[in-house]
Design a protein with these regions (language model features):
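N-terminal glycine-/serine-/threonine-rich phosphate-binding loop
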Residues: 1-34
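Glycine-rich N-terminal segment of FAD-binding domains in flavoprotein oxidoreductases
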Residues: 26-52
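Solvent-exposed alpha-helices and their adjacent loops that cap or buttress functional pockets
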Residues: 27, 52-53, 105-109, 168, ...
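Glycine-rich beta-strand-to-loop/alpha-helix junction loops that act as flexible
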Residues: 36-41, 118-119, 187
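A glycine- and small-aliphatic-rich helix-loop capping segment at beta-alpha/alpha-beta transitions
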Residues: 47-54, 79, 130-139, 201
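Ligand-binding beta-strand-loop-alpha-helix segment within the catalytic cores
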Residues: 54-117
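Class I SAM-dependent methyltransferase SAM-binding "motif I" and its flanking Rossmann-like core
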Residues: 124-171
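ATP/nucleoside-binding phosphotransfer catalytic cores, i.e., glycine-rich phosphate-binding loops
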Residues: 171-174, 178-231
Length: 231
């Protein structure tokens, strides 16, 4: 079962997690593979990262829309990584060769730390929606309507649900669980229900994919007070 850590607010959470990422990266004697989501949840963490301490960092993006958008499109994960993470090196899965992403990760020694977020309405993690198999690997998936609605908030430039892509390429739950450590972030009142659902579980439940954190020996759930169910 994942350990719970509670912070005063999203900024404190982000600073603390960023310091842990930087320290782990500095200790690494090889490229440090950091699994990274796009979207709102990790923004305070990325903002607090110190570029001077991250020369070995490789940002391993967990997903991308299909068809792959222009790297300048507002919904492009490549654009998000460039503007928000700023790692020296960034990897993205290729929908034409999803298995190659798994091989690349394995050949580089595996993901050292996977940062995670949970969908507010359906607990999706990366683009793994309700019912995703625990054994799933990088693949192209059709996005659930709940995931697409959540992405209207993640990418507010979408004018309507009709503009949100219907497919994406995503790492699988087994890809995530293979990482050496997992840190799942929930902050703000709009994530309180998701936090309550996740904290009510003590093992993986395929109806709430983010619960993969409960099936890992080094996993933490980081919430701020606004997201904590008791607040």
């Amino acid at each position: 079962m994942a350990e719970l850590r509670v912070f005063a607010d999203a900024d404190e959470l982000g600073r603390t997690l960023a310091a842990e990422v930087a320290a782990a990266c500095e200790r690494s004697d090889r490229p440090f593979l950091l699994g990274c989501p796009g979207g709102r949840s990790l923004r305070t963490t990325y903002a607090a990262l110190e570029p001077r301490r991250l020369d070995r960092l490789v940002a391993v993006l967990m997903d991308e829309y299909v068809p792959v958008p222009s790297p300048d499109a507002h919904w492009s994960c490549a654009r998000f990584a460039r503007e928000e993470i700023g790692a020296p090196e960034t990897w993205l899965p290729d929908p034409d060769e999803p298995d190659a992403y798994e091989r690349r990760i394995t050949a580089a020694g595996g993901i050292d730390l996977f940062l995670l977020a949970s969908g507010a309405s359906d607990g999706h993690v990366a683009l793994n929606g309700t019912g995703s198999a625990r054994t799933s690997r990088t693949r192209v998936v059709e996005l659930a309507a709940t995931t697409r609605r959540d992405n209207l908030v993640t990418f507010p430039e979408f004018a309507s649900l009709d503009e949100v892509p219907t497919h994406g390429v995503t790492v699988g739950l087994a890809t995530i669980a293979d990482a050496r450590a997992l840190r799942l972030v929930l902050h703000g009142p709009d994530k309180r229900a998701a936090a309550a659902r996740l904290l009510a579980l003590d093992r993986f439940d395929p109806t709430w994919p983010a619960s993969i954190v409960h099936d890992h020996p080094d996993a933490q759930i980081l919430v701020d007070r606004a997201a904590h169910p008791a607040s």
